[in-house]
Amino acid sequence: MGCTLSAEDKAAVERSKMIDRNLREDGEKAAKEVKLLLLGAGESGKSTIVKQMKIIHEDGYSEEECKQYKVVVYSNTIQSIIAIIRAMGRLKIDFGEPARADDARQLFVLAGSAEEGLMTSELAGVIRRLWRDGGVQACFSRSREYQLNDSASYYLNDLDRISQTNYIPTQQDVLRTRVKTTGIVETHFTFKDLYFKMFDVGGQRSERKKWIHCFEGVTAIIFCVALSDYDLVLAEDEEMNRMHESMKLFDSICNNKWFTDTSIILFLNKKDLFEEKIKRSPLTICYPEYTGSNTYEEAAAYIQCQFEDLNRRKDTKEIYTHFTCATDTKNVQFVFDAVTDVIIKNNLKECGLY
């Protein structure tokens, strides 16, 4: 009897080849879809990373889209100067010039009646005089003692530009805007032949219960930490240090059974603010046991170790750490390029293609 295959055998071989081919195609397709979850405590820079993805991978914000952010820029600017003025009362700081007390009263009147998206020359003048006051600057230098947006000085220092009648926010202005994320914001983009689905989830405690809905099929988690938060307390709990809250949260995510096989990427963000702050505010505020110097390199490395040491599966799970400045497009582009290479490698491994 010869070794020739019967028609049925040939059909079976073809079917087997087709199944193998389909499995491989499915594997390759799965390897090209990336579900990224952006997690972290409130105000750690997650939404800014999402905005950067639009700038880097989706041709940025159109002029029309930038115009829509004018309302937010003005709101952030006004709320920042109001927060400083209110803090002066709590911290018992006097105005450098007594006449500024009248400006402060005028600020509250004008801010209360301001039309959305408009900044009158009268309101801009009041804010400008207040911001230049010595007492206001003294209070601003103590901003760790109250809640103040990171973008406060950025907008207030640029008041002449942003208060022009023909003002259109720049991409950088848009990046600096602060709007609390509620719910889940989904962004899609393509990069390095991969189709990314990025989910930005509100970081305040009240928003975290919504995270569970995003967990299924996650390729990688980008966990954002604001390095500059080491000497601040939470807006929602003034007894809790923000860095301690971030560590607690990272511990629960990093060691969660849901994420045993999920790549964890740690963004130690706001490195620019941290580099300035560490010169005047010691790391021992957050870590009393710290004995190193208050230099950027040593203090940042210590914080990195504090987070990486929370990983209880070091033998099987690697944490990929990057120092970032979410408002710096070039920095984010460079870091995200490296992150994508890690995702590609790990994704192909899981699909048996690496």
UniProtKB/Swiss-Prot annotation:
Tissues and organs where the protein is expressed, per its UniProt entry: Ubiquitously expressed.
Chain segments carrying region G2 motif: 173-181
PROSITE patterns: G_ALPHA (PS51882)
Binding site for Mg(2+): S47, T181
Ranges for region G4 motif: 265-272
Membrane topology value: Lipid-anchor
Subcellular location: Cytoplasm; Cell membrane; Cytoplasm, Cytoskeleton, Microtubule organizing center, Centrosome
Lipid-linked residues (N-myristoyl glycine): G2
Claim: S-adenosyl-L-methionine is one of the keywords in the record: no
Superkingdom of origin: Eukaryota
Lipid-linked residues (S-palmitoyl cysteine): C3
Region span, G5 motif: 324-329
Region (G3 motif): 196-205
Protein residues bound to GTP: 42-48, 150-151, 175-181, 201, 203, 269-270, 272-273, 325-327
Binding partners and assembly: Heterotrimeric G proteins are composed of 3 units; alpha, beta and gamma. The alpha subunit contains the guanine nucleotide binding site. GTP binding causes dissociation of the heterotrimer, liberating the individual subunits so that they can interact with downstream effector proteins. Forms a complex with CCDC88A/GIV and EGFR which leads to enhanced EGFR signaling and triggering of cell migration; ligand stimulation is required for recruitment of GNAI3 to the complex. Interacts (inactive GDP-bound form) with CCDC88A/GIV (via GBA motif); the interaction leads to activation of GNAI3.
Record's protein name: Guanine nucleotide-binding protein G(i) subunit alpha-3
Lineage: Eukaryota, Metazoa, Chordata, Craniata, Vertebrata
